Amino acid sequence: MNTNNSVPAPPFHCDDTTDLLPYLQGMIGEIKKSGCTRFLSITLETGYSDPLAILEEIHRPGQAVCYLERPATEFSIACGGLVAEAAFSGEKRFSQAKNWANSIFEMTPIVGNHKFPGTGPTLFIAATFESESTREVSPKPLQVFLPRWQVLRKGGQNFIIYNTEMNAVSSPAS
């Protein structure tokens, strides 16, 4: 996307003092020129955060969520909301999902420090053992989503990740 260097380099480290406005203005300018849609993932390092407590506080019924925890490795992550989602069935569902995931990652600039798994854009899945839905009300055999938000705690470091869709009518101020 940055072929003519009109978009400043994304900040590698983000905290509450990081000014993202120049980067966002440049990115939206490029999107307007190209007419394409992009996703954006911003990782912000924070003080202490408890992913499960945050999930419990902001979860709304019907909202896609996920929570994973590995106490032995001091790892926990919670996520919610949908920025992008897809469902797959049939014998090639995993290869189709991989292609979809690669296309999402190709159009997702990453801002901030993404040194741990779970920082930066992270796709979450739900899968059944069946290749096809057995009933009309059954979940699809493979569902994948990019969440709107993620909260990660890893070995004493804490991160909040915000994912969003950017298009020609996006505003860097909102």
Describe each PLM feature range.
Residues M1-S174:
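Signature of the chorismate-utilizing enzyme
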